[in-house]
């Protein structure tokens, strides 16, 4: 039997019994299941007895071993107690040793201090004695004119003097030593100049060593600067006396300076510890000592160029300077972080500072330049067709000038002149809009839209309308170009001047700007050539405005901007004026006919058969000539509007949707949304005709019964024309014709649902008492 399963964690009694019976299936099958069960029980009892016996034996052995374990534990406790006592004793010994050692070390320190003082005193005495010895021998040494020996003596005297600081005659000795150094410098100066001029490396190294030892390195560098500065200044003088233009002279100067840079760097690297810094100072001093100075040369060059060319010439000069600056930057860039950035910044300032006054007033210069160029763009011509042509051609000229101004701003100010640029652009657009408006007024006069003779014959002339449509298309080009240009301007400003915008700044205050900018500059080493910023220090208010613009562009995105809001609004108004011109070119001839209605004598004069009018049917009357002309003119409008308004022209479509026509639909009119602009124009002209007709009718002082019927016939004719064109007659016109047709005895009843003032006016005209 397998008794090992009793030890399993998942032991199941039923499963074990079933397994035991399955093992003895033969006996169970023969009907001896009870016997088999009895056998299993007996085996289990025997197994239990064996287990009990084993447990008793194990327990007995454990009880026998317990006293031994207890004894071991007791012994361990005694050993731990003894160890604790020993640790306490060791701790006391260590504490005592530390106290004894501390006292010993204190004594040693005091002894060492005494020793150091004694050595210092001995050295001081030796140096003091050395000063006396050297002072006595120095005159003899100078007679040898051996610079190395004299330098060694002076170095010894200098070291001795450091030990004599507290002596009463210390200052006198300092003066004496400086006088000796001056004598040495005077003695060596011819050789120094010769060494630097001939680029003698070994001899120059000797002088560097000598002057370093006697603390006269700045004086030695002054000789170096003077030697090479003289050569560069002479080259500039020669250029100035030549017949070359100023930009060529500047190019020659910068070539000489850049050549000197590369030559001197190679030589100075062998002689000086900081060759780049030394040569940078040479260039800084040379640029500052030029005669005539660069600012005066630039001033003369700009003045000679005149107002029309001053900015162009200035940019030519600046391009030469920028090319030179780029060459220096490339030369310094590989090891820029190793150089003295203060000196690099001074060099950058020395190169660019002559242009600072012009950069600060760039906005004014650009505005003057743009206005001069805009004045050269003709818009006004003798013939209307020529004016229209010039207006169309002026669009590309206008935005060509604006784009060129942006390029100049980037080239000359690196984006810092953005505020001045925006101001100049606004002036440019204002000038253009003013000229455009004047041209529109001139076209109106040439087309005689403002002064149509009262007695002129009614005739169709669509030339003015055709020209007006071309002008509207030009306005569409202006609006489209303005949107594109504004987007490009925003992107250009952000990409160029965006580097000046600190990531941490918020445009709440100027102080916040400057604080964040200073913090950023401390946190990251930057390239002074790329970070040149003339505006922040010299015009902080304009710089703050620039930061506002950049912050807005960055936060809201360059597509959501308002840089040219005023010019855009002005161009929109210009488009509106062009719409008015086109509208007037069509409508004013109708208006001229309608305004004559109130002055016609026939309204209050009895016609032939006046007494029979009441008996005559309405269709016996025919519309008068004035309304027939107007009706025929309006009927011809679709044919004349369609070709010009619905042609495939995106600029024209843009302008037509941006403009607003006069005489909009009356409130409450159910009009379908018309995508066809020709229908919109037709509706506007029709409504203008009806409203003007109504106003003219109400100005008639008196109507005879016949005239009332005639006028009603005229109005019905116009209403039929409107119906034929699919247009709704105005409510006022319908009311008037109703009142004109109403019999006097029915007038009170009919007029109850109509506007009171209108009913009263018509009643007065008809002499109806109600």
From Swiss-Prot:
Compartment(s): Golgi apparatus membrane
GO biological process, one term: protein stabilization
InterPro entries: COG7 (IPR019335)
Keyword Zinc among record annotations: no
Lipid bilayer topology: Peripheral membrane protein
GO cellular component, one term: trans-Golgi network membrane
Disease listed for this protein: Congenital disorder of glycosylation 2E: A multisystem disorder caused by a defect in glycoprotein biosynthesis and characterized by under-glycosylated serum glycoproteins. Congenital disorders of glycosylation result in a wide variety of clinical features, such as defects in the nervous system development, psychomotor retardation, dysmorphic features, hypotonia, coagulation disorders, and immunodeficiency. The broad spectrum of features reflects the critical role of N-glycoproteins during embryonic development, differentiation, and maintenance of cell functions.
Family: Belongs to the COG7 family.
Subunit structure: Component of the conserved oligomeric Golgi complex which is composed of eight different subunits and is required for normal Golgi morphology and localization.
Protein name: Conserved oligomeric Golgi complex subunit 7
């Amino acid at each position: 039997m397998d008794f090992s399963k009793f030890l399993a964690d998942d032991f199941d009694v039923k499963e074990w019994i079933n397994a035991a019976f399955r093992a003895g299936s033969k006996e169970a099958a023969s009907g001896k299941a009870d016997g088999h069960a009895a056998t299993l029980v007996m085996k289990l009892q025997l197994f239990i007895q064996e287990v009990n016996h084993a447990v008793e034996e194990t327990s007995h052995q454990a009880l026998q071993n317990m006293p031994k374990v207890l004894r071991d534990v007791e012994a361990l406790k005694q050993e731990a107690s003894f160890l604790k006592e020993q640790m306490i004793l060791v701790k006391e010994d260590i504490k005592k040793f530390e106290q004894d050692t501390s006292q010993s070390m204190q004594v040693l320190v005091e002894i060492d201090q005494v020793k150091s003082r004694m050595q210092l005193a001995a050295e001081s005495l030796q140096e003091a004695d050395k000063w006396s010895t050297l002072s006595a021998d120095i005159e003899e040494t100078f007679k040898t004119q051996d610079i190395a020996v004299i330098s060694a003596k002076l170095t010894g005297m200098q070291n001795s003097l450091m030990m004599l600081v507290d002596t009463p005659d210390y200052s006198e000795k300092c003066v004496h030593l400086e006088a000796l150094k001056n004598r040495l410098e005077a003695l060596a100066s011819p050789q120094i100049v010769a060494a630097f001029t001939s680029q003698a490396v070994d001899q120059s190294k000797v002088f560097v060593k000598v002057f370093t030892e006697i603390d006269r390195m700045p004086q030695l560098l002054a000789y170096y600067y003077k030697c090479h500065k003289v050569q560069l200044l002479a080259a500039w003088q020669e250029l100035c006396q030549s017949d070359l233009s100023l930009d060529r002279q500047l190019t020659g100067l910068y070539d000489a300076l850049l050549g000197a840079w590369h030559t001197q760097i190679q030589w100075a690297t062998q002689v000086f510890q900081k060759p780049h810094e030394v040569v940078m100072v040479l260039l800084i001093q040379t640029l500052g000592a030029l005669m005539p100075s660069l600012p005066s040369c630039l001033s003369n060059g700009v003045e000679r160029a005149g107002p029309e060319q001053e900015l162009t010439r200035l940019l030519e000069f600046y391009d030469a300077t920028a090319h030179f600056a780029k060459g220096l930057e490339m030369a310094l860039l590989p090891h820029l972080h190793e150089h003295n950035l203060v000196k690099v910044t001074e060099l950058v300032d020395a190169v660019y500072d002559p242009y600072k006054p012009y950069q600060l007033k760039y906005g004014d210069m650009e505005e003057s330049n743009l206005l001069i160029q805009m004045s050269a763009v003709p818009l006004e011509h003798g013939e209307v067709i020529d004016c229209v042509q010039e207006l169309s051609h002026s669009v590309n000229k206008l935005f060509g000038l604006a784009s060129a101004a942006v390029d100049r701003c980037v080239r000359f100010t690196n984006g810092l002149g953005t505020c001045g640029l925006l101001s100049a652009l606004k002036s440019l657009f204002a000038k253009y809009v003013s000229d455009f408006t004047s041209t529109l007024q001139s076209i109106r006069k040439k087309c005689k839209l403002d002064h149509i003779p009262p007695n002129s014959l009614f005739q169709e002339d669509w030339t003015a309308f055709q020209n007006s449509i071309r002008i509207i298309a030009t306005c569409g080009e202006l609006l489209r170009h303005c949107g594109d240009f504004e987007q490009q301007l925003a992107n250009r400003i952000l990409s160029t001047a965006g580097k000046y915008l600190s990531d941490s700044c918020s445009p709440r205050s100027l102080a916040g700007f400057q604080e964040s900018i200073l913090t950023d500059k401390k946190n990251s080493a930057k390239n002074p050539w790329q970070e040149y910023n003339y505006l922040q220090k010299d015009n902080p208010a304009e710089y703050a405005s620039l930061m506002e613009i950049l912050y807005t562009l960055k936060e809201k995105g360059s597509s959501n901007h308002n840089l040219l809001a005023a010019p855009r609004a002005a161009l929109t108004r210009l488009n509106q004026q062009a719409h008015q011109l086109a509208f007037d070119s069509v409508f004013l001839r109708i208006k001229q006919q309608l305004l004559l209605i109130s002055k016609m004598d026939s309204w209050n004069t009895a016609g032939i058969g006046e007494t029979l009018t009441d008996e005559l049917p309405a269709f016996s009357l025919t519309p008068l000539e004035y309304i027939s002309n107007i009706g025929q003119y309006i009927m011809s409008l679709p044919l004349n509007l369609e070709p010009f308004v619905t042609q495939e022209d995106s600029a024209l479509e843009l302008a037509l949707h941006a403009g607003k026509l006069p005489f909009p639909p009356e409130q409450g009119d159910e009009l379908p949304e018309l995508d066809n602009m020709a229908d919109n124009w037709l509706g506007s002209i029709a409504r203008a005709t009806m409203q003007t007709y109504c106003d003219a009718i109400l100005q008639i002082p008196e109507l005879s019964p016949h005239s009332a019927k005639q006028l009603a016939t005229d109005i019905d004719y116009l209403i039929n024309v409107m119906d034929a064109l699919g247009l709704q007659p105005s409510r006022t016109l319908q009311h008037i014709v109703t009142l004109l047709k109403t019999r006097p005895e029915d007038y009170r009843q009919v007029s109850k649902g109509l506007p009171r003032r209108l009913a009263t006016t018509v009643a007065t005209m008809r002499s109806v008492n109600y």
